């Protein structure tokens, strides 16, 4: 019966053609891996479905701290932090690095989590048209003029590598230049 089995990284179309399925979070076909399923059941029995709270209150478990230590060691850094979901990560990283008085120039097509992070940061936000490098340059020039009258402040450009809302890819070399 169609639609009753887990989708994998590849799907067969009605015309017989096999294509990559980028509309699924099952990119690596973990859903069909019996070893991972068994391990997931063991973890659920030991820890339940989630910590249900912020890390410093009652949301941290030994497996979280072990994983953070392992990742930090792998990266060769003193420490790291992991989040339970991508939205939390995205929306909290921006305000962690920026603050009131900073200027952030952002692509108008960034996803909702990035928009929330920009809002939470309380920085001044200037928008440029989606993937429009000429408009980005125009906005940056205006920021430069505005900053001539104000004390030194930090500036950031915020974009996505692969835009969640449009599927477009950013021209990162153009932004960096």
Predicted features, each with a name:
Residues 93-112:
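Conserved PLP-anchoring active-site segment centered on the Schiff-base-forming lysine
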Residues 38-85:
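Conserved N-terminal alpha-helix of the aminotransferase class I/II PLP-enzyme fold
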Residues 126, 131-177:
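Active-site phosphate-binding strand-loop segment of PLP-dependent enzymes
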Residues 1-49:
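N-terminal "arm"/small-domain region of PLP-dependent enzymes with the aminotransferase-like
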Residues 85, 106-122:
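Substrate-binding/gating loop at the entrance of the active-site cleft, primarily
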Residues 29-30, 57-61, 112, 133-134, ...:
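Short, small-residue-enriched loops and turns at beta-alpha junctions
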